[in-house]
């Protein structure tokens, strides 16, 4: 080495290290995103917010809305002149939301009684809704979402499901 030689890293070496760090960071995010318990909590919060928003919208627009859940959360609007339910497609917040694998959801109770899994739970324009509950489940976790007559949604869980 001569007197003008300097020690350091070349641009290529620095770029290789940055690529390795980016790949490791991407893998870490992918692993963390697969945390079922965390996903259950996030999906429950999203669903609870959508339920409260839908109840407020039903009151403010004087319309009856409904909600169903299975592999996706769907909101419906009841025709004013009939008994038909139409998919609600004019609101991004209430657009159909597919649940990530392996989650599913179902109505659990309505007005204190068990309810069929394919039932539409109504959200009345008057704001006087019966209490209802939905279950959000995966093979390992269960979250219960319960709405009271004042349209406040509480979240219980995630709770581990015994094998």
Please give the residue ranges for each predicted region.
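N-terminal helix-rich module
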Residues: 1-3, 12, 16, 23, ...
């Amino acid at each position: 080495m001569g007197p003008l030689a300097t020690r350091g890293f070349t641009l290529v070496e620095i770029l290789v290290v940055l690529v390795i760090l980016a790949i490791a960071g991407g893998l870490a995010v992918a692993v963390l995103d697969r945390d079922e318990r965390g996903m259950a909590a996030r999906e429950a919060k999203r669903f609870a917010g959508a339920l409260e928003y839908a109840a407020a919208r039903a009151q403010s627009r004087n319309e009856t809305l409904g909600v169903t859940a299975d592999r996706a959360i769907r909101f419906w609007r009841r025709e004013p002149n009939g008994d038909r339910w139409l998919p609600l497609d004019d609101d991004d917040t209430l657009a159909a939301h597919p649940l990530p694998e392996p989650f599913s959801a179902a109505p659990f109770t309505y007005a204190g009684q068990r309810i069929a899994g394919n039932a539409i739970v109504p959200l009345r324009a008057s704001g006087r809704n019966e209490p209802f509950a939905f279950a959000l489940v995966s093979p390992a976790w269960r979250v219960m979402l319960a709405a009271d007559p004042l349209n406040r949604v509480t979240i219980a869980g995630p709770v581990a499901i015994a094998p």
